[in-house]
């Protein structure tokens, strides 16, 4: 899937028009404070472009967290985001207490020229996702007529629709596919994401390496399988490496993560790698812990020694790092999805940090390096490497589905040219 036939914002005349823009402001928060503002910062160029080109207003809508269709302003309100956005844009931002309905429609009907309006969390309405939970926590499905009314209300808030929420592009939610306006364009962030991934997947530089980490094999089967048709080499690390090592080497993994369902397909994946001539590198040693805790007692283990009962592997060890770094050094293009250890805790962050340092080094030598959203993007923020790699994706799930070879509904819904 490429963006070449999709309408992009640079081709739309926004002068005097109200722009309703789906952004991805789903930022991590702690005690109502934003802990990583990357997603807000990333949308600023698209917002500024509209204002600089004479847009009457820019109305911003997004989701935050998982309120499941129940208003939870104490937990998931956009009010801290409004403050952050005001600082980043250097101009006033009006924050509305809802995202649809007569009052919101009135506020957005004829605002002052150059207005920036931020709507409250879309997911306070069950009609955004089409499903959610009631006040007692029981699963409910949205009423079809109410979903249509919700979409109609959103469609009244602008004359032009712009989608810059790559992070939610894999979801067929109302704000992604249900705003019915004559022009539906990709914002600059969406365009950059798709251009990078299209290049990576359609005409990659070689050798092409995928670094795949994270916990569950089952969640990554489609990804591993699709990437085995594209890459020359693959590093499999993180929690899911234990499932591979237990199946392939009969390794004793103690209390480390083991994915029962995923384990059934390990041999098929290895057979596919062999058939396609893809070299797979797995970790050979580990930093272990006596419990899943930041302050756990630590130990070391190898594939041969195994991990004792009651202990678990939470990072790859120094020999694995050597092997991984060597593989990275050979690559001309890298897609990295998922850390290779519990990087959030210093004791178990060394493997991922060493890998990141090497990825930064090869980027400087001309290797194209793409970080696929989610936890790996958080690693870049943590170690300040966001501008030292070629591209950090703002979408975890969306980049994953793109790498899995799927069509993204939010892209599909844009106007074709």
From Swiss-Prot:
Keywords: ATP-binding, Cytoplasm, Glycolysis, Kinase, Magnesium, Metal-binding, Nucleotide-binding, Transferase. Gene3D superfamilies: Phosphoglycerate kinase, N-terminal domain. It is found in: Cytoplasm. It comes from the Eukaryota. One of its GO terms (cellular component) is cytosol. Pathway: Carbohydrate degradation; glycolysis; pyruvate from D-glyceraldehyde 3-phosphate: step 2/5. Pfam families: PGK. One of its GO terms (biological process) is gluconeogenesis. AMP binds at residues 215-216, 220, 239, 313, 344. (2R)-3-phosphoglycerate binds at residues 23-26, 38-39, 62-63, 65-66, 122-123, 170-171. ATP binds at residues 215, 220, 239, 313, 344, 375-376. It catalyses: (2R)-3-phosphoglycerate + ATP = (2R)-3-phospho-glyceroyl phosphate + ADP. Mg(2+) binds at residues 215, 219, 375. SUPFAM superfamilies: Phosphoglycerate kinase. PROSITE patterns: PGLYCERATE_KINASE. GO terms for molecular function: ADP binding; ATP binding; metal ion binding; phosphoglycerate kinase activity. Monomer. Catalyzes one of the two ATP producing reactions in the glycolytic pathway via the reversible conversion of 1,3-diphosphoglycerate to 3-phosphoglycerate. In addition to its role as a glycolytic enzyme, it seems that PGK-1 acts as a polymerase alpha cofactor protein (primer recognition protein). May play a role in sperm motility. Belongs to the phosphoglycerate kinase family. This is Phosphoglycerate kinase. The gene is PGK.
